[in-house]
Amino acid sequence: MLAFSDMNTGAGKIENGKKALKIVVVGDGAVGKTCLLLAFSKGEIPTAYVPTVFENFSHVMKYKNEEFILHLWDTAGQEEYDRLRPLSYADSDVVLLCFAVNNRTSFDNISTKWEPEIKHYIDTAKTVLVGLKVDLRKDGSDDVTKQEGDDLCQKLGCVAYIEASSVAKIGLNEVFEKSVDCIFSNKPVPKASVTTQAKSQESTQQKKKSKCLLQ
């Protein structure tokens, strides 16, 4: 097993001669995080919803004539796991900020909960915004639009906004290919807006004041 010894480098690692990175998936419960990981890595779709506490496994992905080892970490979105969830964040290279396009609350929570939480604990990790369940989007409804996702991506300074569907097998490879590219390529990461940067600095200051994660 790969030991991530250098905290929050955001630079990937080498394991058994292959480039490796740790990817953590966060977002509200039931937005499709587990389905995303299983559909991508195993081609499976769970038949029933079972809330995740912690789950992690590795997957070898072939991309650009090279093999990459992806260490995938699934996390619980429920509030009762708020104190435990950050234990999975250490040494993360990429964080997937996930919401369901047919669940506006999950979209709003990216800005109010998930992005601030990630910046608080692992502010050097790259972030990819992922809109899941695009196969369930209905025109003329209150569903989150592609433009709204693009705008939020730019506001938060995410590497990219990608829409995906585990059931329809849309965008799955793109999510993880982009994750690899943002770590092992030299392309600059978009800068967050001034407002977002100010919030991140405030979050970092709060982190320095906290003495214990678990009580």
UniProtKB/Swiss-Prot annotation:
<keyword id="KW-0479">Metal-binding</keyword>
<feature type="binding site">
    <location>
        <position position="33"/>
    </location>
    <ligand>
        <name>GTP</name>
    </ligand>
</feature>
<keyword id="KW-0636">Prenylation</keyword>
<dbReference type="GO" id="GO:0044650">
    <property type="term" value="P:adhesion of symbiont to host cell"/>
</dbReference>
<keyword id="KW-0472">Membrane</keyword>
<feature type="binding site">
    <location>
        <position position="34"/>
    </location>
    <ligand>
        <name>Mg(2+)</name>
    </ligand>
</feature>
<dbReference type="GO" id="GO:0003924">
    <property type="term" value="F:GTPase activity"/>
</dbReference>
<keyword id="KW-0342">GTP-binding</keyword>
<feature type="compositionally biased region" description="Low complexity">
    <location>
        <begin position="195"/>
        <end position="204"/>
    </location>
</feature>
<dbReference type="GO" id="GO:0007165">
    <property type="term" value="P:signal transduction"/>
</dbReference>
<dbReference type="GO" id="GO:0008360">
    <property type="term" value="P:regulation of cell shape"/>
</dbReference>
<comment type="subunit">
    <text>Interacts (GTP-bound form) with formin1 (via GBD/FH3 domain); the interaction activates formin1. Interacts (GTP-bound form) with profilin1. Interacts (GDP-bound form and when prenylated) with RhoGDI.</text>
</comment>
<keyword id="KW-0968">Cytoplasmic vesicle</keyword>
<dbReference type="GO" id="GO:0005856">
    <property type="term" value="C:cytoskeleton"/>
</dbReference>
<dbReference type="GO" id="GO:0007264">
    <property type="term" value="P:small GTPase-mediated signal transduction"/>
</dbReference>
<keyword id="KW-0488">Methylation</keyword>
<feature type="region of interest" description="Disordered">
    <location>
        <begin position="194"/>
        <end position="215"/>
    </location>
</feature>
<feature type="binding site">
    <location>
        <position position="31"/>
    </location>
    <ligand>
        <name>GTP</name>
    </ligand>
</feature>
<keyword id="KW-0966">Cell projection</keyword>
<dbReference type="GO" id="GO:0001891">
    <property type="term" value="C:phagocytic cup"/>
</dbReference>
<dbReference type="GO" id="GO:0007163">
    <property type="term" value="P:establishment or maintenance of cell polarity"/>
</dbReference>
<dbReference type="GO" id="GO:0030865">
    <property type="term" value="P:cortical cytoskeleton organization"/>
</dbReference>
<keyword id="KW-0581">Phagocytosis</keyword>
<dbReference type="GO" id="GO:1905161">
    <property type="term" value="P:protein localization to phagocytic vesicle"/>
</dbReference>
<feature type="propeptide" description="Removed in mature form">
    <location>
        <begin position="213"/>
        <end position="215"/>
    </location>
</feature>
<keyword id="KW-0449">Lipoprotein</keyword>
<comment type="function">
    <text>Small GTPase which cycles between active GTP-bound and inactive GDP-bound states. Involved in actin cytoskeleton remodeling. Regulates phagocytosis by modulating actin cytoskeleton dynamics through the recruitment of formin1 and profilin1 to the phagocytosis nucleation site.</text>
</comment>
<dbReference type="GO" id="GO:0007015">
    <property type="term" value="P:actin filament organization"/>
</dbReference>
<dbReference type="GO" id="GO:0042995">
    <property type="term" value="C:cell projection"/>
</dbReference>
<keyword id="KW-0460">Magnesium</keyword>
<keyword id="KW-0378">Hydrolase</keyword>
<dbReference type="Pfam" id="PF00071">
    <property type="entry name" value="Ras"/>
</dbReference>
<dbReference type="InterPro" id="IPR027417">
    <property type="entry name" value="P-loop_NTPase"/>
</dbReference>
<feature type="binding site">
    <location>
        <position position="166"/>
    </location>
    <ligand>
        <name>GTP</name>
    </ligand>
</feature>
<feature type="lipid moiety-binding region" description="S-geranylgeranyl cysteine">
    <location>
        <position position="212"/>
    </location>
</feature>
<feature type="binding site">
    <location>
        <position position="135"/>
    </location>
    <ligand>
        <name>GTP</name>
    </ligand>
</feature>
<dbReference type="InterPro" id="IPR005225">
    <property type="entry name" value="Small_GTP-bd"/>
</dbReference>
<dbReference type="GO" id="GO:0045335">
    <property type="term" value="C:phagocytic vesicle"/>
</dbReference>
<keyword id="KW-1003">Cell membrane</keyword>
<feature type="short sequence motif" description="Switch 1">
    <location>
        <begin position="43"/>
        <end position="54"/>
    </location>
</feature>
<feature type="binding site">
    <location>
        <position position="34"/>
    </location>
    <ligand>
        <name>GTP</name>
    </ligand>
</feature>
<protein>
    <recommendedName>
        <fullName>Ras-like GTP-binding protein RHO1</fullName>
        <ecNumber>3.6.5.2</ecNumber>
    </recommendedName>
</protein>
